[in-house]
UniProtKB/Swiss-Prot annotation:
One of its GO terms (cellular component) is extracellular region. It comes from Arthroderma benhamiae (strain ATCC MYA-4681 / CBS 112371). It is found in: Secreted. It is an enzyme of class 3 (hydrolase). This is Ribonuclease ARB_07070. InterPro entries: Ribonuclease/ribotoxin, RNase_U2. Belongs to the ribonuclease U2 family. Residues 26-51 are annotated as: Disordered. This purine-specific ribonuclease cleaves 28S RNA in eukaryotic ribosomes, inhibits protein synthesis, and shows antitumor activity. The active site is at E103 (proton acceptor), H144 (proton donor).
Length: 160
């Protein structure tokens, strides 16, 4: 069962980060115009600085899709990430040490939830929600850095 605190936290994250942009496989990440900084930096700016009505509407859609993915999915996530790893210390809400974490794909499409049982596997996209394995407590939104023409490869960085 997901706690009220987790639901409240997720409902408020919409204002905490910019709207993600869709990166086509033919568009290298380094040429996409996205600003990516190291984990020690300020994170990634995934949208423009002018919050138009469309951007605000898309951000609300993204938050609803994140909630749907986290709360309505019967699966427990893609992979286990150790909370003792240095790679996750820069999450916006780091978990206590020793907690197991899972990644959940984040989609921009309305009502899209990742199908873990599809064959061949679906493209999860570069963006991931990180939550604790057992309680699904929200820890942050991260994205792959991308390698060449593949935006789903490479190291992760925090999305703001």
């Amino acid at each position: 069962m997901v706690s009220f605190k987790a639901i409240l936290t997720l409902s408020l994250i919409g204002a905490a980060f910019a709207t993600p942009i869709e990166q086509r496989a033919a568009e290298p990440v380094e040429d996409s115009g996205a600003v990516a900084n190291s984990p020690e930096g300020s994170g990634m700016d995934l949208g423009g600085t002018d919050p138009t009505a469309d951007a605000i509407e898309e951000r609300g859609l993204l938050v609803r899709n994140i909630l749907r993915q986290l709360l309505n999915n019967k699966q427990s996530g893609l992979t286990i990430i150790s909370s003792t790893s240095n790679a996750i210390t820069w999450l916006s809400r780091p978990p206590r040490r020793g907690r197991s974490l899972r990644e959940y794909p984040v989609f921009q499409q309305h009502h899209k939830v990742y199908n873990y049982n599809s064959r061949p596997k679906e493209n999860p996209g570069p963006f991931r929600l990180i939550a604790t394995k057992d309680s699904r407590h929200f820890c942050g939104i991260i994205s792959h850095d991308g390698i060449g023409h593949n935006p789903n490869a490479g190291l992760f960085h925090l999305c703001k």
